[in-house]
């Protein structure tokens, strides 16, 4: 179980939240603070050492992650592959590896899955279910790909096709996207 705060908290509230949910044993609290407020991140991490903290969906280059990594101000880095791209995210992961930090992309789909299997610091990937009622699992990219993998019993099977292993659906109309 994780909580995403979308940069909405301050230091006292972050600490109060971590204390209030301590018994829930959350895997992480995500983006409690703006990603570049490193001093505040270090403060909440020191105040609540049992809690893993994550950030990164609004930081999309290795240069933005450099100080976050060096200062160890969070436990988990979450670049968004849709913005950072595969090459830059692999560079971020290489930097994180030297500090024993996890990288769990803030996105789902073929890009994140392929990154996950190529990274030694990514123990799992997120899956964000975009079905309107969440009653079934649907492809992240809708009808754009003909063979986009979706999780089955918590696992994703990737193809051995070139690139990201997904084939574009030539039949899809722009209005459907």
Regions found by a protein language model. Give the residues of each.
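Shared catalytic-loop signature of beta/alpha-barrel
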Residues: 19, 25-28, 36-155, 159
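Hydrophobic/aromatic residues in well-formed alpha-helices
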Residues: 14, 41, 172-173
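Loop-centered beta-sheet repeat module
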Residues: 1-21
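Extended hydrophobic packing segments that form well-structured cores
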Residues: 162-177
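Conserved hydrophobic beta-strand within the GNAT/NAT acetyltransferase core sheet
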Residues: 1-5, 31, 55
């Amino acid at each position: 179980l994780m909580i995403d705060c979308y940069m909405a908290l301050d230091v006292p509230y972050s600490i109060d939240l971590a204390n209030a949910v301590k018994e829930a044993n959350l895997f992480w609290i995500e983006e409690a603070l703006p990603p570049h407020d490193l001093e505040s991140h270090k403060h909440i991490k020191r105040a609540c050492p049992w809690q893993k903290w994550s950030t990164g969906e609004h930081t999309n280059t290795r240069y933005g992650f450099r100080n976050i990594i060096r200062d160890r101000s969070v436990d988990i880095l979450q670049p968004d592959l849709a913005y950072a791209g595969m090459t830059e995210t692999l560079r971020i992961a290489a930097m994180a590896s030297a500090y024993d930090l996890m990288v769990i992309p803030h996105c789902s789909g073929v890009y994140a899955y392929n990154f996950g299997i190529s990274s030694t610091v990514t123990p799992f990937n997120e899956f964000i279910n975009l079905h309107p009622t969440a009653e079934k699992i649907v492809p992240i990219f809708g009808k754009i790909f003909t063979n986009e993998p979706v999780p089955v019993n918590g696992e994703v099977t990737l193809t051995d096709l070139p690139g990201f292993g997904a084939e574009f659906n030539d039949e899809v109309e722009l209005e459907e996207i």
